[in-house]
From Swiss-Prot:
It is found in: Nucleus, Nucleolus. One of its GO terms (molecular function) is ubiquitin-like ligase-substrate adaptor activity. Belongs to the WD repeat DCAF13/WDSOF1 family. The keyword rRNA processing applies. The gene is DCAF13. This is DDB1- and CUL4-associated factor 13. It comes from Gallus gallus (Chicken).
Length: 445
């Protein structure tokens, strides 16, 4: 006689220790879960609400400067070290872990106009209103030693910006022209110029390291190649560009911060129209910096706010502001992609989280899995009206809120006027110009 018996493997359901979780048998057949999507929607809604509840982005304020913070630089090798230069010529080096100043030195008379660290992290360069370029050791001087620069170069004109090559002992300064310097020489290797207006910013490309871009006060963005003696090309915009930043992951992409409240992301091969126009600020954009991932960038504006933009979106995903923060002059995204630093003209440097609701510290494996699951749910249901409304909601200062409202009315009036003009004109006489091409005056090769 044959007898059928149930045979179970204890390893499938018995815990090894009392601390282990009970194993729950699950059947993933969709026919048994008709309300799966509805449950996921509720979970996504709750996750979105909790994200807004836990959004506490502000971490710390680094105070110590006695004048407005004019520029900042990141240490290329150390995540916890950042440098800042003020309007009174003082340079401070900060430890972000301890959130305190570890070194202060009087670098220049007048403004510190620009600063950058050497690619190996052993020294840094500063330029100021006193027409000098100075190289300083990154380490503090020993006991009894005086704080002296390694090299000092006295120029003929005021330098307004500086940036270091990503691989070689070469740096570039800008003022009346773009000068390329060797660290061992006191005169520039070559000088590049196109036009007669002063240049406010110069930046090396981190991937194609021989390329650099500059912003001039005559509304030009000029691109150069160090290997040839003449500039490559330039694009002229409606208003002046304050600074630009290259995408660290895509060699030909850069973003320009403009006086017309917008940021423009360009592909340097096709300058006739920007890849994307980023608009949300209500005053001039003064600085921009990319995330190390190249997916997002942060901008600082004269409207006393900091905004985070996805590269492929026209509007910001996040806006940071405080009651005491004044005009934000400079901004940096840390090299671990988790924090943002901004320097403003009321003498403070502020440290923010890049993701406002991110939990800091070590996460348990279950906690990490739950966060990843919630993130996927939010992405899945991000276009549902209720979830979209909660995720986009932000509290803004009254001044910014009123200016946004005013800008919206003005934009709508311009659009209406253009439609009326086209309607009452001869067909084809009033061409349709896209938002991307409206702001480009000309491209000169």
């Amino acid at each position: 006689m044959r007898v059928k018996v149930l045979s179970r493997n204890p390893d499938d359901y018995v815990r090894e220790t009392k601390l282990d979780l009970q194993r729950v048998p699950r059947n993933y057949d969709p026919a048994l879960h008709p309300f799966e999507v509805a449950r996921e929607y509720v979970r996504a809604l709750n996750a979105t609400k909790l994200e807004r509840v836990f959004a506490k982005p502000f971490l710390s304020s680094l105070d110590g400067h006695r004048d407005g913070v004019n520029c900042m630089a990141k240490h290329p090798k150390s995540l916890s070290t950042v440098l800042s230069g003020a309007c009174d010529g003082e340079v401070r080096i900060w430890n972000l872990t301890k959130r305190q100043c570890i070194r202060a030195l009087q670098a220049h008379e007048g403004f510190v106009r620009g600063m950058c660290a050497r690619f190996c992290g052993t020294s840094f360069f500063t330029v100021g209103d006193d027409k000098t370029v100075k190289q300083w050791k990154m380490e503090s001087p020993g006991y009894g030693e005086e704080e002296e620069p390694i090299h000092t170069i006295l120029g003929k004109t005021v330098y307004t910006g500086i940036d270091h090559h990503w691989k070689d002992a070469v740096f570039a300064t800008c003022g009346q022209q773009v000068d390329i310097w060797d660290e061992q020489r006191t005169s520039p290797m070559c000088s590049l110029t196109w036009g007669f207006d002063s240049i406010s910013s110069v930046k090396f490309n981190p991937i194609e390291t021989y390329l650099l871009g500059s912003c001039a006060s005559d509304r030009n963005i000029v691109l150069y190649d160090m290997r040839q003696s003449t500039p490559l090309k330039k694009v002229i915009l409606n208003m002046r560009t304050n600074t630009l930043c290259w995408n660290p992951m895509e060699a030909f992409i850069f973003t320009a911060a403009n006086e017309d409240y917008n940021l423009y992301t360009f592909d340097m091969r096709f300058l006739t129209s920007p890849v994307m126009v980023h608009m949300d600020h209500v005053s001039a954009v003064l600085d921009v910096d990319y995330s190390p991932t190249g997916k997002e960038f942060v901008s600082a504006s004269f409207d006393k706010s900091v905004r985070i933009f996805p590269v492929d979106k026209g509007h910001s995903r996040e806006v940071y502001h405080t009651k005491r923060m004044q005009h934000v002059i400079t901004v940096k995204w840390t090299s671990d992609s988790r924090y943002i630093l901004c320097g403003s003209d009321e003498m403070n440097i502020r440290l923010w989280k890049a993701n406002a609701s991110e939990k800091l510290g070590v996460l348990a494996p279950r906690e990490k899995a739950a966060m990843n699951y919630n993130q996927k749910l939010k992405e899945k249901f991000q276009h549902h009206p209720q979830i979209k409304r909660i995720a986009r909601h932000r509290h803004l200062p009254k001044s910014i809120y009123c200016q946004i409202k005013e800008q919206r009315i003005m934009r709508e009036a311009r659009r209406r006027k253009e439609l009326n003009r086209r309607k009452h004109s001869k067909p084809g006489s009033v061409p349709v110009v896209s938002e991307k091409k409206k702001h480009i005056v000309a491209v000169v090769q």
